[in-house]
């Protein structure tokens, strides 16, 4: 899970309080947010680098994508982590794995940083994970077999296991260090509710594409919680070819969901992922929710081989009742007009034309 925000005049949200009601212990609609304006950070790239980028522009019919350096991304997460580490805090887990730097810290909340980028805060991680999991799990009839691609912290897994119909879950994550942390650090184990010790769970420490190249039984639900497409390598996780491959692992009435960044801060990335899934031959439904610790809303795409599977999902009541989703899912499928307009600019990300990481860097620059 992954979360990157746009840096230009970014608005940082801090949760100051929340109200409880009988239905919801933590209701995202009732957060009182304190909004703080942060001034722009100066980009110190020299002029020659800028000229080189201009020479490498990627053209599409409606959009010009200019490659930018990734060091300009996610400055606020790095600043936040430094401030935490400089003050009173508890380091719950710290390791440089073969793939990333992992920092699990505790102040008032528990926060996971991967390569200095915030992945979740325990204050509101349920908002993200319930939105990722429950719409699809509630819509697919009696899901028995579930595949989770990514999600090594076990938080999406926790939500999946709430469904009594589920008999078998395969979780695929590349980083064994993440899995070990999620299994053994008490604060994370408390968050994921011992999910990795459920007898229904099978963990596969390998690359998702490697797993998808192996024969397997079909799945009723597939949950894609890949990192954001910040690099060309990560962009390969969001190609039409890979989405088409994932679709072959679905049962006739199965569906998958893909985390897809922010339709507010990265609309070109968000809608391009949806467009790429559609080009793989699937029916797509798009939705989003506000995640306060991310400082923005976050978007997802549902997809299926059979259009009827997602019929009237907006009118769905979710059971088991999540703590943070509205009782009726309809609001999640509504977008502001300015966000919908960006849909017309959506691109196709394919193995022969990897462009999503360039869209991403362009939208995330400051």
From Swiss-Prot:
The keyword Cytoplasm applies. Its EC number is 2.5.1.16. GO terms for biological process: polyamine biosynthetic process; spermidine biosynthetic process. It comes from the Bacteria. Pathway: Amine and polyamine biosynthesis; spermidine biosynthesis; spermidine from putrescine: step 1/1. Keywords: Cytoplasm, Polyamine biosynthesis, Spermidine biosynthesis, Transferase. The active site is at 225 (proton acceptor). GO terms for cellular component: cytoplasm. Residues 20-61 are annotated as: Disordered. Residues 20-58 have a biased composition (Basic and acidic residues). CDD domains: AdoMet_MTases. S-methyl-5'-thioadenosine binds at residues 100, 173, 207-208. Residues 74-305 form the PABS domain. It is found in: Cytoplasm. InterPro entries: PABS, PABS_CS, SAM-dependent_MTases_sf, Spermi_synthase. Belongs to the spermidine/spermine synthase family. Catalyzes the irreversible transfer of a propylamine group from the amino donor S-adenosylmethioninamine (decarboxy-AdoMet) to putrescine (1,4-diaminobutane) to yield spermidine. HAMAP family: Spermidine_synth. Homodimer or homotetramer. NCBIfam families: PRK01581.1. This is Polyamine aminopropyltransferase 2.
């Amino acid at each position: 899970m992954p979360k990157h925000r746009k840096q230009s005049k970014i608005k940082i949200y801090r949760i100051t309080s929340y109200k409880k009601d009988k239905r919801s212990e933590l209701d995202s609609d009732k957060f009182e947010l304190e909004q703080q304006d942060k001034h722009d950070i100066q980009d110190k790239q020299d002029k020659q680098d800028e000229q080189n980028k201009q020479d490498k522009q990627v053209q599409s019919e409606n959009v010009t994508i200019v490659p930018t350096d990734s060091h300009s991304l996610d400055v606020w997460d790095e600043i936040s982590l430094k401030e935490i580490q400089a003050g009173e805090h508890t380091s719950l887990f710290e390791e440089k794995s073969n793939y990333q730097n992992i920092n699990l810290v505790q102040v008032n909340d528990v926060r996971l940083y991967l390569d200095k980028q915030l992945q979740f805060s325990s204050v509101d991680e349920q908002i993200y994970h319930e939105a990722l999991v429950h719409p699809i799990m509630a819509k697919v009839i009696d899901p028995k077999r579930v595949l989770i691609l990514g999600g090594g912290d076990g938080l999406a897994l926790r939500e999946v296991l709430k469904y009594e119909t589920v008999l078998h879950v395969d979780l695929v994550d590349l980083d064994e260090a993440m899995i070990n942390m999620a299994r053994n650090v008490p604060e994370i184990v408390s968050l994921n509710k011992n999910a990795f010790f459920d007898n229904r769970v099978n963990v596969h420490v390998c690359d998702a594409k490697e797993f998808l190249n192996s024969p397997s039984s079909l799945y009723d639900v597939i949950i894609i919680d890949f990192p954001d497409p910040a690099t060309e390598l990560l962009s390969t996780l969001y190609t039409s070819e890979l989405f088409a491959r994932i679709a072959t692992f679905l049962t006739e009435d199965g569906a998958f969901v893909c985390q897809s960044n922010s339709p507010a801060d990265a609309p070109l990335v968000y809608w391009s992922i949806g467009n790429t899934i559609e080009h793989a031959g699937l029916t797509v439904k798009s939705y989003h929710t506000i995640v306060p610790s991310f400082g923005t809303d976050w978007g997802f795409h549902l997809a299926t081989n059979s259009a009827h599977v997602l019929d009237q999902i907006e009118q769905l009541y979710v059971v088991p009742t999540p703590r943070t989703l509205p009782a009726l899912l309809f609001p999640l499928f509504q977008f502001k007009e300015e966000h919908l307009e960006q849909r017309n600019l959506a691109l196709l990300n394919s193995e022969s034309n990897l462009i999503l990481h360039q869209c991403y860097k362009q939208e995330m620059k400051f």
